[in-house]
């Protein structure tokens, strides 16, 4: 049984490897990123920019790698989940890094204004 699981995981890795994006920067929880997303409206396709704080990250080295991004549109906080290896994601750029001591920053949902700021890391 164990040998079958090992063979299956190797098969999955060999199938996923060509589909994964290699030019993605290192993204950590707490980073402020700008993400380009292809949006189809009718017959036209345009690129939509989304900028916000990364609240969580799941499955780091997999085809299903996703992150939860908290943006604010017109004064309202919006959270979206993005799959990083999706063909709809055109680019990811890290704008600012922050020092955080948690793996998930869900507590930022309840904070307003200056309280929701994170301590910035200067490189």
UniProtKB/Swiss-Prot annotation:
Protein keywords: Chloroplast, Plastid, Ribonucleoprotein, Ribosomal protein
Keyword Ubl conjugation found: no
Domain of life: Eukaryota
Subcellular location: Plastid, Chloroplast
Cellular component, GO annotation: chloroplast; mitochondrial large ribosomal subunit
GO MF term set: structural constituent of ribosome
Keyword Metal-binding attributed: no
Family of the protein in this entry: Belongs to the bacterial ribosomal protein bL19 family.
Protein name, UniProt field: Large ribosomal subunit protein bL19c
UniProt organism field: Porphyra purpurea (Red seaweed)
Origin organism lineage: Eukaryota, Rhodophyta, Bangiophyceae, Bangiales, Bangiaceae
């Amino acid at each position: 049984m164990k040998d079958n699981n090992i063979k299956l995981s190797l098969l999955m890795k060999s199938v996923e490897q060509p589909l994964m994006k290699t030019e993605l920067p290192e993204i950590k929880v707490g980073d402020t990123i700008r993400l380009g997303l292809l949006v189809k409206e009718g017959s036209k396709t345009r690129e939509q920019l989304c900028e916000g704080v990364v609240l969580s990250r799941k499955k780091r080295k997999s085809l299903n790698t996703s992150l939860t991004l908290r943006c604010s549109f017109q004064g309202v906080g919006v959270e979206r989940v993005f799959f990083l290896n999706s063909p709809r994601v055109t680019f990811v750029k890290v704008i600012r890094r922050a020092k955080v001591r948690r793996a998930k920053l869900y507590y930022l949902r309840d904070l307003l204004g200056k309280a929701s700021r994170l301590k910035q890391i200067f490189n």
